[in-house]
Amino acid sequence: MHTCRATKKSPSGSANVSRKIGFEERKAEDLLKNSISIPYPDGKIFTPTALSNDGIAYGEAVDQGHEDQNYLASMNLHTKEFQKIKDVEKTSNLTHVAVSYVDHDIVVFEEYDQLNQTGIYYLWKIKDKSLTTLIDRRPIGTVPVTQVARSNQKLFINYEVGDSLYQIEEFDLETGSHQTIESKNSGFPNVFKNYLYYVQIDNTALTTKIVAYSLSDGQKKVIDQTKDDQRYYVDLMTNGHNLLYLVANNKDASFTFENKNHKKIFSTSQAETSIYRNIYLTYMGERRSEERVKSQYYLWDLKHRIHYLYDHGPILLSDKGILWIQFKKKDSEIPKGEIYRNENSVMRYQEW
């Protein structure tokens, strides 16, 4: 699915990109100064990868001294309550858990085994603590790339069915029924108003189409498409009020964020794992300094056109808040794989 990519530039420093596109630059502390500090649970190594609107972080965890057994866990950022949800079934030492979607009532996650190439998707219902298997797929790619969108009691899961072919499956949470609604190679499903929007990807012709699938009658309509290998859609995202496109431009190796009417918001040399919630956009991009070792994260206020200069760890957004990882030392001094330890960083949480 992801072979449609612009060639990324090497790090050259992009701190001034916002000045060229009409965004005011501010220190990230101006926005995040009221964030509360939340240490990691004692005796646990917890890696938060998803944030719900009710202030609960979800991710993979292990108990220190028992790193061979990982599990899905949650942490209430208001009460600091830490909860184990499910142990990972260790079919090999390369079995991990990836959180695909969280809401106030459900969690969708995958346990994947890179060695045996198996992956199982689960639905966790929070209120009654019930677990349902949604998908059992074999074989899988080495790293799962799964996106989930929701409309009321229907889930739309985009996942690999084999040979780099990604399809979209609809699951009914009330009846348990499911059906394939897009069998062609596709990605980036987003529910916006009364439609499911997604990108149809032809990796042979190197073209992309944006498809609108009606949630009321199931009709599909192509609303936009690229016609050559110089420009193509590589992501869609919504905050519930606006729909954004991420466009790759091979001519100048750039990525452009546009709105649904193709009004350009800004361009950058690299943008991955984008999250758009409320008025904020974050993504992983080009390192702003040659001294930076770990991934560089960006934070933008699209409503007030502010680029917050941010130099700490991963960022998670919800409609109501932000969870960010504050480094306690230079990123180059934190050993690989040891960010989420109390001696190296602290979780910071703030609601809007």
Q: Could you say what each language-model-derived stretch is?
A:
Residues M1-V17:
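Sec-dependent signal peptide cleavage junction
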Residues R150, F171-N249, I275, L281-Y283:
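Extended alpha-helical regions
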Residues N93-Y101, D105-Q147:
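Non-cytosolic head/periplasmic domains of membrane-anchored proteins
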Residues G43-N53, S92-D103, I140-N152, S183-N194, ...:
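Repeated scaffold domains used in trafficking and secretory/extracellular systems
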Residues G13-P41, Q64-D87, L115-R137, V161-E182, ...:
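Surface-exposed loop/turn elements that mediate protein-protein interactions on large endomembrane-trafficking
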Residues A73-S74, K84, A98, I106-V108, ...:
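Ordered hydrophobic segments in well-structured contexts
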